[in-house]
């Protein structure tokens, strides 16, 4: 059985191009060693069109039966990554192939690297497929909604084991280049099948990789080779455009550098990008503006729930200069009438979420104005999802959400299924603690849709979840899409 499963995995490596035909024996022997096995019988039958998930499941069962690992998703992930490492080309080979293909054209290089990142099981295709995805029409365009199910839920045993492991300081975080080839531990994922392409932006060493959880097509991460904290400054804009010049078919954006309005990792300077057009990129300029000293730069307020100033020019240097001017002005800007305070008690509040892209021969930069002030009424943030929407989304509104993609928690899959069941059978929603938090929302829905039934309930819930996301984005907008909000926004623009 083991020999057969190993033969299948090796065949998968040959079929996908991870290994050449001449490395068949070598790879077989590496895999035998992982199982502490010194005997092998080549199967008589030939295997084709191998399904990776099935073969790995066979090999994981074998490892559990032999007592090599515990039957838990954490240990299984560590082990199957070790198996995939036996099929992986070395980093130098990946880099050489990447830049050779880049010589043909940048897209050929990223196509190769994205396929490798999936074939290697670094991106687990069969898990990403489980994510629930749909779109919702809104006044701001077609928004993307996803319930993220590709991050596996840790089981209680693994959580307990992780508690007992003293937290290591190597690698310093999940974005450090030292992750490449790392075997992992209970509280840190294995990254033996992970490859990084070194790139130079702003004359400094950075790394280019894909996100293992791909929230959208070719979701990439670009990170500083050194563990330095996030900081939005002039150099941020230089780096964004250096990358877009290298890969003009990709956009690249940065999370803000302050808590509440920033991303989940503020400790390591990084950007996120990819080959995808978000609703925000399609959103039109609602009001064109001219900024003194930058009359040659097309600028305007975008029709978008967050407060976005879009600037466009064929020369990215002009955009870098203007973005720096806007950033410096916003950092120090206070307008009490609009409830915008640059700082309170010495704590800064104003920052920017920038997104760079190239459209035809024109460079474009979206500057999203952010503010992380809190009040007694809104202790998690005034410009953050308000409490009435926390039953759907209470996490930070980071770069991905800013662009129009809701990344919703996995709990919603079960909760929405339960809601369908309870609504159709007329059961009391407050009687189930898993869904009691949705009670007020459901009351509103029942008034809005008196003819809700088994045929339409699924579509109705999906649509209404999407509309909650719209409200959440509006909450995160410093200047609201109202006459007063636009007037307040123009006061800032006029101050430039």
Regions found by a protein language model. Give the residues of each.
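Active-site microenvironments that recognize anionic phosphate/pyrophosphate groups
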Residues: 1-222, 226-229, 303-305, 319-323, ...
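Catalytic or ion-translocation cores adjacent to nucleophile or general acid/base/metal-coordination motifs
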Residues: 244, 248-267, 273-327, 331-334
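Structured alpha-helical segments in the cores of large, soluble enzyme domains
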Residues: 206-211, 236, 240-244, 290-297
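Amphipathic alpha-helical segments that form well-ordered structural scaffolds
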Residues: 239-243, 325, 468
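Helical scaffold of the NTase/Pol beta-like nucleotidyltransferase catalytic core
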Residues: 193-195, 227-252
């Amino acid at each position: 059985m083991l020999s057969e499963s190993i033969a299948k995995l090796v065949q998968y490596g040959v079929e996908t191009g991870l290994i050449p035909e001449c490395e068949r024996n070598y790879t077989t022997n590496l895999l035998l060693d992982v199982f502490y096995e010194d005997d092998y019988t080549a199967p008589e039958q030939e295997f084709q069109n191998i399904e990776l998930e099935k073969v790995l499941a066979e090999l994981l069962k074998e490892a559990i039966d032999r007592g090599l690992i515990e039957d838990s998703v954490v240990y299984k992930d560590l082990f199957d990554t070790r198996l995939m490492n036996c099929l992986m080309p070395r980093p130098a080979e990946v880099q050489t192939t990447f830049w050779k293909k880049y010589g043909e054209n940048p897209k050929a290089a990223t196509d190769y690297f994205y396929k490798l990142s999936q074939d290697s099981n670094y991106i687990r295709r069969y898990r990403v497929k489980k994510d629930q995805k749909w779109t919702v029409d809104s006044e701001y365009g077609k928004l993307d909604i996803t319930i993220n199910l590709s991050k596996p839920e840790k089981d209680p045993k693994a959580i307990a084991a992780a508690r007992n492991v003293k937290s290591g300081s190597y690698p310093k975080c999940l974005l450090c280049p030292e992750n490449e080839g790392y075997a992992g531990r209970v509280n840190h994922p294995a990254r033996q099948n992970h490859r990084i392409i070194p790139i130079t932006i702003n004359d400094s060493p950075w790394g280019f990789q894909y996100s293992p959880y791909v929230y959208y097509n070719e979701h990439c991460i670009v990170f500083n080779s050194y563990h330095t904290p996030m900081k939005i400054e002039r150099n941020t804009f230089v780096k964004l455009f250096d990358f877009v010049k290298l890969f003009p078919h990709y956009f690249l954006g940065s999370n803000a550098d302050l808590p509440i309005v920033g991303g989940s990792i503020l400790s390591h300077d990084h950007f996120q990008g990819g080959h995808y057009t978000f609703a925000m990129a399609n959103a039109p300029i609602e009001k064109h503006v001219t900024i003194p000293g930058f009359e040659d730069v097309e600028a305007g307020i975008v029709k978008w729930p967050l407060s976005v100033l879009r600037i466009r020019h064929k020369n990215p240097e002009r955009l870098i200069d203007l973005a720096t001017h806007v950033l410096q002005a916003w950092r120090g800007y206070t307008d009490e009438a609009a409830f915008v305070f640059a700082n309170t008690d010495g704590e800064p509040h104003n920052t920017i979420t920038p997104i760079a892209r190239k459209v035809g021969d024109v460079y474009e930069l979206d500057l999203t104005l952010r503010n992380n002030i809190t009040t007694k009424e809104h202790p998690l943030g005034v410009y953050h999802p308000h409490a009435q929407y926390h039953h759907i989304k209470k996490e930070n509104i980071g770069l991905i959400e800013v662009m129009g993609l809701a990344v919703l928690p996995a709990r919603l899959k079960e909760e929405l299924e339960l809601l369908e069941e309870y609504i159709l059978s007329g059961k009391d929603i407050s009687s189930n603690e898993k869904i009691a938090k949705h009670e007020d929302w459901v009351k509103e829905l029942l008034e809005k849709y008196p003819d809700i039934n088994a045929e339409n309930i699924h579509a109705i819930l999906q649509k209404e979840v999407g509309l909650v996301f719209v409200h959440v984005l509006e909450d995160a907008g410093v200047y609201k899409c109202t006459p007063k909000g636009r007037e307040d926004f123009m006061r800032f623009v006029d101050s430039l």
